[in-house]
C-alpha cells in the first residue's frame, strides 16, 4: 500500500474504519479532510509564486484561480507582494474599508487590498510594471486525475488522520474518533514545528578552533 497516493490513502482509510458499508463515502471523507487542511495548515509546499504584468492606470489585478485537476492553482493567502521597480517595493496590506475612501491617484504602488478574487493597488501605477506574488494556494484535491499532491507526499499521516476525523459522524460511535483527533492534532503540531525549524535558523553553538 502506497499511502502517498489517492488509491493508497483510500485503502488505508478503509482499513482503519474496518467497515465495508462506508467504502463509497471515503472520497467524501478525503474531500472534507482537504477542506480542513486548507483552513488549518500552512506549509512551504503550499506556497506558489506568480508574475503578473500590470498596465499603467490599472488598479484591479485578478488573483490566481484555476480549478482544473493537474493544474490546480487557487489563491488562499498572501505571503509577499512585490512591485518590480528600481528598487523593488514590498507592498503592505490595506483593509478594504480604508481602500474605499482612498483617493485614486497614479504613482508608485505601495499598498494593496484584496476584495473577492482581485487585489487592488494603491496607488494605481503611473507606468506599466510587474507584480511578483508569493502566496499560499489551495491543496490540489485528490482524484483519479490528481493521484497525489505535495501535501500528501510530504505528510500522508496528516491526510489520513484528517480523513478519519471527518468520518466520525458516519461511524456513530463505532470508531475511536477521539483517538484519531488526538493523532491528527499531534501530526499537525509536528508539521508546524518542522515548518518553523525550516524557516528560522536556530542558534548554533560553535566550538572554538583548537590550535596545535
Give the positions of each predicted feature:
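Glycine-enriched, solvent-exposed interface loops adjoining structured elements
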Residues: 1-212
Amino acid at each position: 500500500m502506497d499511502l502517498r497516493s489517492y488509491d493508497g490513502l483510500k485503502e488505508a482509510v478503509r482499513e482503519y474504519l474496518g467497515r465495508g458499508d462506508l467504502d463509497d463515502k471515503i472520497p467524501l471523507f478525503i474531500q472534507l479532510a482537504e477542506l480542513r487542511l486548507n483552513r488549518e495548515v500552512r506549509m512551504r509546499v503550499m506556497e506558489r509564486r506568480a508574475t503578473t504584468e500590470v498596465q499603467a492606470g490599472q488598479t484591479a489585478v485578478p488573483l490566481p484561480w484555476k480549478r482544473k485537476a493537474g493544474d490546480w492553482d487557487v489563491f488562499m493567502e498572501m505571503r509577499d507582494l512585490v512591485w518590480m521597480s528600481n528598487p523593488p517595493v514590498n507592498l503592505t496590506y490595506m483593509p478594504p474599508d480604508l481602500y474605499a475612501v482612498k483617493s485614486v491617484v497614479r504613482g508608485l504602488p505601495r499598498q494593496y487590498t484584496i476584495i473577492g478574487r482581485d487585489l487592488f493597488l494603491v496607488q494605481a501605477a503611473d507606468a506599466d510594471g510587474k507584480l511578483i506574488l508569493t502566496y499560499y494556494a489551495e491543496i490540489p484535491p485528490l482524484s483519479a486525475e490528481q493521484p497525489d499532491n505535495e501535501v500528501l507526499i510530504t505528510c500522508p499521516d496528516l491526510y489520513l488522520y484528517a480523513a478519519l476525523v471527518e468520518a466520525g459522524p458516519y461511524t456513530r460511535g463505532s470508531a475511536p474518533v477521539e483517538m484519531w483527533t488526538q493523532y491528527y492534532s499531534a501530526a499537525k503540531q509536528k508539521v508546524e514545528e518542522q515548518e518553523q525549524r525550516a524557516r528560522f535558523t536556530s542558534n548554533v553553538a560553535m566550538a572554538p578552533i583548537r590550535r596545535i
